[in-house]
Every structure is written in C-alpha cells, then in structure tokens.
Amino acid sequence: GLKDMIKNLAKEAAVKLAGAVINRFSPQPQ
C-alpha cells in the first residue's frame, strides 16, 4: 500500500544519505 511505498522511499533515501556521508568522511584514493 501507500505506507509501504513511503517506507521504501524513506529507506532508499536513508541509504543514499548514509552512502553520501560515508563517502564524504572516508578517505578516497585519488
């Protein structure tokens, strides 16, 4: 239902946000 869709969207957003934060704060080989 709609609640599940919202839950999935929130989960994806949280995962993306966590990934961005981790990428920003972890040393990147350049």
Swiss-Prot record:
It comes from Physalaemus nattereri (Cuyaba dwarf frog). Keywords: Amphibian defense peptide, Antibiotic, Antimicrobial, Secreted. It is found in: Secreted. Its main location: secreted. It comes from the Eukaryota. One of its GO terms (cellular component) is extracellular region. Expressed by the skin glands. Probably has antibacterial activity. The lineage of its organism: Eukaryota, Metazoa, Chordata, Craniata, Vertebrata. GO terms for biological process: defense response to bacterium. This is Nattererin-2.
